[in-house]
Amino acid sequence: TWYGDAVIMDFVPATADDAKLPREPEAKVKEHAMNDLMWSAEHIAEKPAEKGRIAKGTVLSMIARFNLLWGNYSEALDAANKVIALNQYELDPDFLNMFSMSGQNSKEIICTYEHVQTTYAYGDVIRFYNNSDGGWASFVPTQNMVDMFEMADGKLIDEAGSGYDPVHPFYNRDPRLKNTVIYSGLDWIGRNGVSRIFNTLDKTLPGGSSNKDYYTAADNASHTGML
C-alpha cells in the first residue's frame, strides 16, 4: 500500500467502538486485498450487466495494476494477458474520441464512472477547473504524471538522445500529453466561451491586474499550474 500498515475492515460495524480497529501489517493488507480480487475474478461475470458496473476485465486490471505497483511483474503480466484474452478491449484509433459523446462506448474503456446529469449536474466539472472558470482545481495533474509521457519518438524524457528540453518541456512530446493536460501557452476556451491563452506563469497580467490562474493564487488555482 502507499501508506504502509492499515486497518482491515471486512464487516459492517454496528457501533463506533466496533470500528476502532488496530492497523494490520502492510504485507497482510496486501494479501487481504489480493485474495479478495482473485476471488472476484473467479466469480464475477465477464461482461457488466450495464454501463458503470464492475466485470471481470475491471477486476483483472486492478490485479495487474496492484502487482505492477508492488513490483510483482510476472503476476502483473499474467493478469494483463488475461484482460487481453477476454477480447473485449482494444486501443481507440482516435485518442480524442474517448472524450467525446461518440466515444462513450469506445472499446478502450474497461470500466466507466457514469455521470448522471439530473442528479449531479456539474460536480465533476467543478473539481477540475480553476476558480477563474468556476471550478475548485481539486484534481490536477502532477509533474510526476507529466514526466511519464514519452517524447514523440517513444523515448523517455531522461533517456539518452530523447531531445527533451527542460526549458520547453512540452515540445515534441507524445501527442496524448497535449490532449490530456492543459498547460501554460495553450489556447483555452474558459468561462462563458471566452477564449484566452492559458497562463499560470505570470503573477500579474498586462495592465497590472492579478492573474487568478497563477499557480500560487489563493483563489483555488491549480498548485501545479496545470489542469
Label the model's feature ranges.
Residues 203-227:
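Active-site beta-strand/loop architecture of penicillin-binding DD-peptidases
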Residues 1-54, 70-75, 220-227:
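Aromatic-anchored glycine-rich loop motif in surface-exposed flexible loops
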Residues 30, 34, 38-41, 56-208:
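An aromatic- and glycine-enriched ligand-binding surface/loop that stacks and positions planar moieties
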